[in-house]
Amino acid sequence: MNKNNAFIGLCLGLSMAFQVHAQKPVAAPMKDVNQVIDNTLDSLNKARTARPVPGSSRKGNNPVLFLVGNSTMRTGTLGNGNNGQWGWGYFAHEYFDENRITVENHALGGTSSRTFYNHLWPEVLEGVRKGDWVIIELGHNDNGPYDSGRARASIPGIGKDSLVVTIKETGVKETVYTYGEYMRRFIRDVKKRGAHPILMSLTPRNAWEDADSTIVTRVNETFGLWAKQVAKKEHVPFIDLNEITACKFETFGKEKVKYMFYLDRIHTSEFGARVNAASAAEGIRNYKKLALAKYLKPIEKDTVTGATRKKGCPVLFTIGDSTVRNEDKGDGMWGWGSVIAELMDTTRISVENHAMAGRSARTYLDEGRWDKVYNALRPGDFVLIQFGHNDAGDINIGKARAELPGAGGESKVFLMEATGKYKVIYTFGWYLRKFIMDVKEKGAYPIVLSHTPRNKWDNGQIERNTNSFGAWTRQAAEEAGAWFIDLNKITADKLQDMGFNEGLRVVGEYFKRDHTHTSLKGARLNAQSIVDGVRQIDCPLKNYIK
């Protein structure tokens, strides 16, 4: 018995020795710097019903572009923005010719390279065919404990280290590999299918290196570096999405970058998601001899906005609603933006009226009209901004063009009746501040106006917007550092004098068909009021007045 016990003891000792040898020390897991709770992965069955069936979008024999990532690519289970957060994968398809290639977003919030590979990848891989493309952007969640809680950390680095763990909550055993090893496994699996893998670095967070907030924190010493190293060794493309977007954020500045995110510092708003999607497309387009680029839509060049620019001269852009731009012909309704050039020295400055009837500040932005002006801006240009007439009413039904009232930082997610999609709506003043920040970013001059007065009277006094849109416009301008002209007051004072001295019949000649839209005479009156206001402020635009 003693000999048997000794033999058994020897075997146990050797077994333990071998286990210790197999479990040589590995690097500690990465710290969870995001501190964001995302339980999406905990509902895998629900997630599978929400995500597309792999390969189901394929048209004939066309290739499919599969997106593999986490919540920065697809937020939550549905990825539909119902919490105000959007992943860039939702908008990626807009950059591709979907008659030649389709895009499927298989990302899932809360996943790491390890958990995606173990739980979701086998199913995605089933849909991958020869000639397809797979973009892999993972790493945000490769942190925390190896063997408890979310148990999603990969071993830092790209080495061959491994670690056998037993998940404390479930008792399930699992071998954990390095981040680089998971990337290599993705790559090998894709190549075996005859498809093309692409690695991307992580989207940047709203984090800055310096006290002045001029340098965005990169991942070029961790996940970005490791993905790049693996891509090089495996001879696959690497696109530094982190660097491309971070450079844009640094141009935007800290205040503008804030609204690129929603609720936290890692998950993007629609604005930020669209920036990341554009950066991904830019990286694909600029990567030398990357065949995926041939499926991108051609870049559409705007040949209209800013086309009047004379060499060495600024442009005065006007944006707003129908009181700024209307029919602008004959005896019809006119907007002041179509006549203000009469008061400018057009040998030294050109004037372009980009207002559109029926628009609020929000819908002018949502329809992409502002983007055209923004992209055309050059240092030294001027932008006259006037909204307010169409910014009240329904937010998500009917015309659905209103904002939240006020000029604060509030926002709310609404389900839009017309589109069936979720959208974050901000205050009226927020949209004005965005326009102002964008103008200043380009080195141009923003001038914000309270909206034109209506031909509405109460006990002999013309109606003014002093306590509503006028006040919110002034507040937004002052907070964002723009010039403010109280157009509503300047013109209202003139109309008040006419109404008091000569009767309302004379005032009526300045309007057309209703109490809001102006005749040519009224448009010229408002244009003159703007010039009067410019002369009262210390704005360089006064140097271009006749």
Name the predicted role of every residue range.
Residues T77-G81, A211-R218, D328-D331, Y364-L365, ...:
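Short, solvent-exposed loop/turn segments at secondary-structure boundaries
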Residues K297-V304, K546:
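A short, charged, Gly/Pro-tolerant segment at domain boundaries
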Residues E123-E270, R274, A281-K289, K372-H517, ...:
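Alpha-helical cap/lid subdomain in secreted, periplasmic
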